[in-house]
Amino acid sequence: MSRFLICSFALVLLYPAGIDMYLVGLPRIAADLNASEAQLHIAFSVYLAGMAAAMLFAGKVADRSGRKPVAIPGAALFIIASVFCSLAETSALFLAGRFLQGLGAGCCYVVAFAILRDTLDDRRRAKVLSLLNGITCIIPVLAPVLGHLIMLKFPWQSLFWTMATMGIALLMLSLFILKETRPAAPTTSDKPRENSESLLNRFFLSRVVITTLSVSVILTFVNTSPVLLMEIMGFERGEYATIMALTAGVSMTVSFSTPFALGIFKPRTLMITSQVLFLAAGITLAVSPSHAVSLFGITLICAGFSVGFGVAMSQALGPFSLRAGVASSTLGIAQVCGSSLWIWLAAVVGIGAWNMLIGILIACSIVSLLLIMFVAPGRPVAAHEEIHHHA
């Protein structure tokens, strides 16, 4: 079982590492490519677009051909794209490389969740996804620090060679450690069950909405945090970095505690707690009389996301034993596109950073609480339905 956990964690972590590691080198990249930093900031959106594009096909391929045939090309593409970025001499070529990186990371991301659905039952999967969420929170803190240390001695291209090295390590894991977990092709008697695993069932769609809104909350916070903390609240750059590190610490602590909480409380209770924390955060930020109270509201955001997201993802994947790849892709596309659409629309309409965050917090909590309370889980995994544990 440990091989599947290690491989799944590695497959998922490629995605945030690809986002956060290069940011520290952005000024030098812009100077070398004769582009402005503003022009290259679109590299974040291009990377996410690549991920979304990969998710359009990766899930279906993973369900038909297996998890390894998607993970291996995904890791290989990430390696090639990282090298391509390091060799880019124009901003257009650099952005093309970032799109290809996103394609590779998206393939790996989809496979990771499909593997966890293949190998873990509902309760264990919720615990593992909560742990994974905590580990993922470390990357935005560690990746820029690692990038800074690398650039003390080496040029910005070394950041992408480091990413390529990470891709090589993942490729080796996928080739030699990861075992295929895709369930056997459905027999004639399994066809009714396969057909019953519809992406349009109410429970799955409710969890798609909940997880998409939750991701929108956390990405809105990340995107608006420089404005909120430095421009509005007046913190210096060093203080901003410290606050963001502390929020990551809150996320990690809550995420690592959630598996223990699942041994005491029902998953539904933790999901309700998550949304109540979001609602409390929105109200706190809306009426905050001081910076200290605002910072407390920010910690509620991190805690709310960490306590509920892994549980919601586990519930979303639960009904799909034969179509886990497609379900994982659907979740990923909805989360990437939905959160990006909200941030873009809010900016176009001219909603300020503070109101943008408060608005999504309150909307997410109200909609999600209604869905949690009124959309009951579908059928559990039947007793005869095998959970695939491989040696």
From Swiss-Prot:
Its main location: membrane. The chain crosses the membrane at residues 4-24, 42-62, 69-89, 93-113, 131-151, 158-178, 203-222, 245-265, 269-289, 293-313, 331-351, 356-376. GO terms for biological process: response to antibiotic. It is a multi-pass membrane protein. InterPro entries: MFS, MFS_dom, MFS_Efflux_Transporters, MFS_trans_sf, Multidrug-R_MdtL. The keyword Aminoacyl-tRNA synthetase does not apply. This is Multidrug resistance protein MdtL. GO terms for molecular function: transmembrane transporter activity. Residues 25-41, 90-92, 152-157, 223-244, 290-292, 352-355 are periplasmic. GO terms for cellular component: plasma membrane. Residues 1-3, 63-68, 114-130, 179-202, 266-268, 314-330, 377-391 are cytoplasmic. Confers resistance to chloramphenicol. Keywords: Antibiotic resistance, Cell inner membrane, Cell membrane, Membrane, Transmembrane, Transmembrane helix, Transport. It is found in: Cell inner membrane. Belongs to the major facilitator superfamily. DHA1 family. MdtL (TC 2.A.1.2.22) subfamily. HAMAP family: MFS_MdtL. The keyword Glycosyltransferase does not apply. Gene3D superfamilies: Multidrug resistance protein D. PANTHER family: CHLORAMPHENICOL EFFLUX PUMP RV0191, PURINE EFFLUX PUMP PBUE.
